[in-house]
Amino acid sequence: MALLPYQVIPNDWDEFYSEQVQESLLESLDTFYHQPLLDSQQTIGATDFVALDIETTGLNAQQDDIVSIGLVPFDHQRIYLAKAKHWVVSSHRLTPESVMVHGITHTDVAQAPSLKSVLPEIMESLQGKQVVVHYRYMEREFMRTAVAELCQQNFLFPVIDTLEIEARYLRENQTLMARFMNKQLPSLRLLYARERYHLPAYENHNALVDALATAELLQAQIANHQLTK
């Protein structure tokens, strides 16, 4: 199987999914790619979302590990916390610096299952839903790289990126002079993006909490910007 290079995204998602169905060697991945992609004309109100967040040992998907994954299913009005999922997974690359950020310790990862062992449940939770992240170059690239390393398989999916939505609307609301001077946008970090919609402050760097925060942010963006598709 030809693995797509780091950060390369398919031009045609339907074609990519069809190719992966033919080439997949994992039952869970085969099932994932058999699920049809959401119709591009489907309305927001008819869409099932799942917010994905991860915690890692660093910022480089090719050098660092995932140590925690959080998933929160939701729609444009409701969040289904009873169906939310959270995993801490094993890693040999944990550093004192990363422990200070997310609070996941060597003891936690030593007692945790491997990422490979929980991948089928993660894939099942994502399949058939529109995945939502805050900064796709973290969540999607880390998941893609991990599956490529562990299973020698492609694991890619379309995402809605709340950071990109926020950046787009902030640019649109800039004054002409600010655009001309290439003035820097306000912070796009999840915490500050939420503040602009008067959402409550949550604990940072917990994968489950950040997934919830991302879900709430998209709901606020949908409502405030009257997004329909």
Task: Show where each model-derived region lies.
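Long, acidic (Asp/Glu-rich), low-complexity accessory segments flanking structured domains
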Residues: M1-E15, L25-L26
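Conserved non-catalytic scaffold segment of RNase H-like nuclease domains
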Residues: E15-L52, T56-F157, M181-H205
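Short alpha-helix plus adjacent loop in nuclease-associated cores
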Residues: I160-N182
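Generic recognition of well-ordered alpha-helical segments
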Residues: I165-R168, A193, L217
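Alpha-helical transmembrane segments that form the membrane-embedded catalytic/substrate-binding core
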Residues: L208-L217
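The feature marks non-catalytic terminal segments
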Residues: Q219-K229
